[in-house]
Amino acid sequence: MFEAVENGSADYGVLPIENSTAGDIRQTYDLLAKYNFYICKRTQIKINHCLAAKPGADIKTIYSHEQALKQCFGFLKDYHARQVPYTNTALAAEMVANSDDNTIAAICSERCAELYGLETVKRDIADNPDNTTRFICISKRPEATPDADIISICMSLPHTTGSLYRMLIRFALYGLNITKIESAPVPQAKQDIKRETFDVVFYLDFEGNALDPEVVRLMTILEEEMKYFKFLGNYKHFD
């Protein structure tokens, strides 16, 4: 998807970034750091997983995206079938439908099971009945609008005493509320960050608008002080 947006064959891309059960989707964050794309919208959707297979299947192996497998951990723990991560839930269902192997199944949506002619073996198998995933829409250009109210950035801090404190206190001094902060290993493919063993980048979401001069001033200061800084986008919360 990132390559499609990069080469112009798609204007926008939509991908998951966080799940209420399994947490952050690390691959998405790594891709945001690697490519020069921007988040322009964000929304959240309740996800209902089911176990799907061909009629009469003797299920020994279950395929699905690794996030779906994590979200259904409790169900799978008691099912005693081998779990195999797959590209995504839809492709897992397609693979099961096209296979001659009658011992495999997929975790996917009921709609997907219907689409590929699979039988729903078990409905609502996610551990959390309110299992919800946040999705972002990305574009090649930033799309700041007057009603955008969340800004996402990532940065790598200098290895000096108090650097994290000094970064965080700036948000308080500017009256900007941080809604999320996560640290993660520096993506292997990120060449413009000087990487050391166990070095990390911080991903932050905070309330603000990129058209606000005070917000621009803060991000300018951070860009000057950090080892690495990247603006990831400004968008409306759950637009």
Question: Residue ranges of each PLM-predicted region?
Answer:
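Domain-level signature for soluble enzymes in the chorismate/prephenate branch of the shikimate pathway
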Residues: 1-239
